[in-house]
Amino acid sequence: MRVHITLECTECHERNYLSSKNRRNNPDRVEFKKYCPRDRKVTLHRETK
């Protein structure tokens, strides 16, 4: 079952991206390196509740 998640920047704590994940394959919180428009650089984005 795929669920919608929000990705938050670890540096500025802005919620920049919406995504989906499969809970069966990824039960833990996912992390991606994505572009943060506020910092104007690529930063680590983590899943929020």
Swiss-Prot record:
Q: Does the keyword Cytoplasm apply?
A: no
Which SUPFAM superfamilies would you find in this protein's record?
Answer: Zn-binding ribosomal proteins
According to the UniProt entry, the coiled-coil residues are none
**What InterPro entries does the record tag this protein with?**
Ribosomal_bL33, Ribosomal_bL33_CS, Ribosomal_bL33_sf, Ribosomal_zn-bd
Looking up NCBIfam families in the UniProt record yields:
PRK00504.1 (NF001764), PRK00595.1 (NF001860), rpmG_bact (TIGR01023)
Q: Which UniProt keywords apply?
A: Ribonucleoprotein, Ribosomal protein
The UniProt similarity line reads: Belongs to the bacterial ribosomal protein bL33 family.
| Pfam families in alphabetical order | Ribosomal_L33
Name the UniProt record assigns to this protein: Large ribosomal subunit protein bL33B
Which branch of life, at top level? Bacteria
Gene designation per UniProt: rpmG2
Write out the GO biological process terms: translation
- Say yes or no: keyword Ribonucleoprotein present: yes
- A Gene Ontology molecular function term of the record: structural constituent of ribosome
Extract one GO cellular component term from the record.
cytoplasm
